[in-house]
């Protein structure tokens, strides 16, 4: 579906109607018969369509003529005014900062043709995309930009996107993510008073699915167990080959994948940390739709991924939403009642991942949920926002995946959980969650609560380090080879641990 400027023009083949997205301050033309969701996507919006537009998740609700409908199931058959509930200024919280670690400026050979070159790093996450602009003469960070990953329209998790690509071809997924990268780089260059044509190197990270979809590599082996990537090696390519509108001879590098869905983003985290050189047993956790875990020290690293699912991103939770204005992001208990903090200090319209963890931890503390996850009755934080039994079960599935992954890696390593000296939490969700809540619900073993440190967007930080220092890029190859990958999907022992971790800790475990 192609959008045009608003005119009275009518298509010779199909009638076109004017669609006004009132709260987005956006108007477009859409062909008759397309869905409102397709019109949103074509207009450059990033609606929540976690089920891929199949009418199952209920997250794409909009209001038309005073009636709430699903955008994915509503056909364009007339001029429409649509209310999405997302004002243009309301944007999701997307973390760009890391721990502040930097690499010595030593970029190696750069393409010639500009006296003031720019470098870039891009972290393609399942939920969001973050880009960094760096001075190509000294490595100074000039700016960061982020947007929601437009691939969310094809599914909330990596397996559903790989399956979509398998059944429908991957061109749409590849095209929309490349376009997103172009938008970010163009805005970054403009913000620095420069041209995108000055960007001579881009270093990219993302999980194996994001890697394959960006590069146009078939995802059939990632759609089904044992989830094997077709390419794991680091890539040194030309940006022009992938329609990235920068310097005509710009380099496009991808850090290597490790195995399964443990991809270049995890390697970026390793580049930005010291797991391969430290003596202390360290656990690196990137909690998201697909949780990636690395355990080890200078004597060796072991890695796995766990299908935590999209509950932490707001999918499959009745009142769930991403971390944007109106989301309950933190919950505490005072005088036997729950107290909620809402992003934007406004009326609560939903609950995001960090609020979900806090909310469950508080309900456990109040005795509203027992160890099995049984909820006394639907619990309302506000008139509009609540958790029900189904929501608690979805949380149990997600938290059990992370907890079972940690236990499984410890068993493979031959250590006890208590032997872990440090826990490094990477990623946006890890930055906003309360470690006490994560431990109270048993997502992270309670005995590790005081050993938890958030390291922010370490994946993006590692990509920046590789962009400004050629040796760090080469180091990423060594790190990927050093990390032993464990496929938990085929491990019967993992399945048993997973079932055990479905329960919440007893009171004695998290006092």
Indicate where each model-derived feature is located.
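Gly/Thr-rich phosphate-binding beta-strand-loop-beta motif of the actin/hexokinase/Hsp70
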Residues: 114-151, 281-298, 435
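A short acidic Gly-Thr/Ser loop motif
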Residues: 33, 53-56, 75, 122-128, ...
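Helical "lid/coupling" subdomains associated with nucleotide-phosphate turnover
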Residues: 160-169, 176, 180-187, 211-215, ...
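Fe-S ferredoxin-like electron-transfer domains
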Residues: 3-6, 66-121, 200
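Short glycine-rich, Thr/Ser-proximal phosphate-binding strand/loop in the N-terminal lobe
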Residues: 133-171, 305-312
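Eukaryote-biased recognition of intrinsically disordered, low-complexity regulatory segments
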Residues: 15-26
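Local cysteine-cluster metal-coordination motifs and their immediate loop/turn environment
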Residues: 46-78
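Short, contiguous acidic and Ser/Thr-rich linear segments
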Residues: 24-34
């Amino acid at each position: 579906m192609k959008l045009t400027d608003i005119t009275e023009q009518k298509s010779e083949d199909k009638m076109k109607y004017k669609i006004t997205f009132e709260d987005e301050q956006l108007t477009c033309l859409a062909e008759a018969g397309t869905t409102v969701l397709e019109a949103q996507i074509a207009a450059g919006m990033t609606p929540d369509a976690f089920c891929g537009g199949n009418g199952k998740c209920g997250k794409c609700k909009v209001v038309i003529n005073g009636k709430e409908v699903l955008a994915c199931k509503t056909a364009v058959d007339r001029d429409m005014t649509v209310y999405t509930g997302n004002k243009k200024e309301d944007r999701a919280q997307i973390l760009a900062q890391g721990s502040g670690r930097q690499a010595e400026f030593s970029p190696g050979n750069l393409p010639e043709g500009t006296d003031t070159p720019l470098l870039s790093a891009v972290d393609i996450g399942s939920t969001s995309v973050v880009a960094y602009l760096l001075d190509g003469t000294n490595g100074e960070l000039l700016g960061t930009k982020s947007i929601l990953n437009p691939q969310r329209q094809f599914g909330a998790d990596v397996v559903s996107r790989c399956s979509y690509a398998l059944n429908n071809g991957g061109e749409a997924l590849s095209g929309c993510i490349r376009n997103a990268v172009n938008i970010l780089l163009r805005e970054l260059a403009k913000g620095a008073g420069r041209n995108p044509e000055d960007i001579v190197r881009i270093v990219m990270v993302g999980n194996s699915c994001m890697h394959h979809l960006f590069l146009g590599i078939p995802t059939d082996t990632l759609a089904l167990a044992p989830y094997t990537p077709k390419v794991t090696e680091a890539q040194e390519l030309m940006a022009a080959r992938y329609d990235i509108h920068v310097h005509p001879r710009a380099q496009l590098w991808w850090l290597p994948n490790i195995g399964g869905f443990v991809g270049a983003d995890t390697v970026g985290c390793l580049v930005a940390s010291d797991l391969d050189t430290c003596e202390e047993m360290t656990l690196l956790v990137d909690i998201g739709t697909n949780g990636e875990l690395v355990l080890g020290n200078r004597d060796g690293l072991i890695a796995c991924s766990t299908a935590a699912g999209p509950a932490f991103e707001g999918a499959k939770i009745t009142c769930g939403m991403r971390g944007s204005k109106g989301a309950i992001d933190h919950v505490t208990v005072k005088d036997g009642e729950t107290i909620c903090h809402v992003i934007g200090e406004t009326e609560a319209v939903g609950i995001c991942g960090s609020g979900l963890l806090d909310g469950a931890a508080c309900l456990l503390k109040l005795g509203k949920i027992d160890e099995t996850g049984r909820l006394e009755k639907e619990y309302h934080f506000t008139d509009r926002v609540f958790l029900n039994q189904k929501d608690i079960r979805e949380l149990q599935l997600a938290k059990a995946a992370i907890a079972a992954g940690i236990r499984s890696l410890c068993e493979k390593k031959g250590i006890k959980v208590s032997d872990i000296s440090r826990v490094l939490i990477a990623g946006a969700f890890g930055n906003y969650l309360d470690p006490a809540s994560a431990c109270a619900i048993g997502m992270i073993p309670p005995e590790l609560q005081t050993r938890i440190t958030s390291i922010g967007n370490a994946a993006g930080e590692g990509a920046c380090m590789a962009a400004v220092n050629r040796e760090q890029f080469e180091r990423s190859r060594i790190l990927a080879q050093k990390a032993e990958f464990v496929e938990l999907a085929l491990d019967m022992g993992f399945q048993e641990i997973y079932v055990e971790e479905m329960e919440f800790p007893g009171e004695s475990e998290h006092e």
